[in-house]
Amino acid sequence: MILTGKEILKRLGSDIKIEPYDEKLLNPNSYNLRLHEDLLVYSEFPLDMKKPNPVRTLKIPEEGLLLEPGNLYLGRTIEFTETHNLVPMLEGRSSIGRLGMFVHITAGFGDVGFKGFWTLEIQVTHPLRVYSGVQICQIFYHTVEGEISEYKSGKYQANQGIQPSLLYKDFEKK
């Protein structure tokens, strides 16, 4: 089951934390999250799954930043979220999709217990100017059946910013 907006509001401060929170961003069954001003782009190619890949930071200026097709831009939400006893999920807003923007490639799913900023894997189908602070995606929450084991560790838990791929750490464990 997906929580309603009223239930999201009721669980704020207990099962759900959203900081900063603005009631104007609450929807009937989700909450809109906004795009931070920083983006990361990979700076050396080809990328290698077994190694850290260098990135450079782009700042979205007040007049916006033109994103180009064929590039991957890693962004993040302004909001820091923390979720307990629920599964958080992220989806792009339809207004964003109708401009040809994808906000995640495969990482729209969070684990019970995840806390952090959401890293966005942004791609565009044609040149598109983006702006910091735009309501870019929405978070919604599923209830869970069965005994819950919270996500306590991991490569991306309690992150403090945009997270490039840390897949190389999986190879180090072998």
Swiss-Prot record:
The keyword Hydrolase applies. One of its GO terms (biological process) is dUTP biosynthetic process. The record marks 108-109 as: Important for bifunctional activity. Pathway: Pyrimidine metabolism; dUMP biosynthesis; dUMP from dCTP: step 1/1. Keywords: Hydrolase, Nucleotide metabolism, Nucleotide-binding. Its EC number is 3.5.4.30. CDD domains: trimeric_dUTPase. One of its GO terms (molecular function) is dCTP deaminase activity. It holds the Pfam family DCD. DCTP binds at residues 93-98, 111, 119-121, 138, 151. Transmembrane segments: none annotated. The keyword Ubl conjugation does not apply. It catalyses: dCTP + 2 H2O = dUMP + NH4(+) + diphosphate. InterPro entries: dCTP_deaminase, dUTPase-like_sf, dUTPase_trimeric. The active site is at residue 121. Homotrimer. Belongs to the dCTP deaminase family. Bifunctional enzyme that catalyzes both the deamination of dCTP to dUTP and the hydrolysis of dUTP to dUMP without releasing the toxic dUTP intermediate. This is dCTP deaminase, dUMP-forming. It comes from Leptospira biflexa serovar Patoc (strain Patoc 1 / ATCC 23582 / Paris). The gene is dcd.
